Amino acid sequence: MQYVATIRGVRYINDSKATNVNSCWYALESMTTPTVLILGGTDKGNDYSEIDDLIKEKCHTLIFMGKDNSKLIEHFASINIPQICTDNIQDAVKAAYQNAQVGDTVLLSPCCASFDLFHNYEDRGIQYMNAVRNL
């Protein structure tokens, strides 16, 4: 995980390398502040139920980012927190910025491969960091 910036009291963390649910689980487990989670991309047959409890405990907003968010929407529909769909990293970061509060962390930990919108996870991370810095 890579610290990106703190903007208006909100920390932004890049965990673009978390291309599976297990990696996202560890990232969420380490969060010590209320979290806005950005996730999504090319699903690899993920079992998202592995992170349900941590999302309920740690997150107050989910932001789905990708060309096809239908599996994420379907899975997390029963979790009673705001869920926002976006189709690019810039909109995902803007939505996170609008929904985060002072003291929160915005975490990009996608659970998915990056190939729907990016060349690879490094490209996704760079675009995330650039979008944060452009807020």
Residue ranges and their predicted role:
Residues M1-C59:
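Nucleotide phosphate-binding/pyrophosphate-handling subdomain across enzymes
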Residues S23, K71-L72, L117:
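Phosphate- and divalent-cation-binding pockets in alpha/beta enzyme and binding domains
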Residues L107-C111:
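Short beta-strands and strand-loop turn motifs
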Residues F115-Y121:
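Glycine/threonine-rich flexible loop motifs
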Residues D116, M129-L135:
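Phosphate-binding loop of NTP-binding sites
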